[in-house]
């Protein structure tokens, strides 16, 4: 057969070299070990000590690079609920209820979820509070679902009133168009009450009476502007 002439395109020359195939790019992948899952790179390194996004999901990795299962505390002190499928978000139950942000970080203090106010108690590890809870010196009431009570009465032996902010009322307070009086413990008073050198009468419902009041054969006049 005819030999190709020098310079023939069929024969590789320095001016027309055959390009080698480029090497496959280094990739990272999930690798399962006895200790759990780790996200490893081809160069022998892996993710560790934090929360990172992999494939559109956020995962926690401990100091050895493994995905923990359960509560994980990041180096900055933030808590996450870690699973093999990524960190949890939203409401999470582990004995008590906890609230996790969109990034998975546990939140504490007053939080609004679904239009309802909740208190995640930092003194209880972030657990959702229920019942009577004192925050910065003020008493609040959270129902069994954790929702803060506001502008409503709560009965716990005595009657207590929670204002619009959720704070328990003490002293004189107005609910609707009616005046009431609660002692220092927040318990609604009834009957005669002395305050500031004046006497006031509170009916069985706790409402302050005004005008003429008859008790047995005795009549008393309670000023409409102040009781």
Labelled PLM ranges:
Residues 1-227:
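Extracellular adhesion/carbohydrate-binding repeat motifs centered on closely spaced tryptophans
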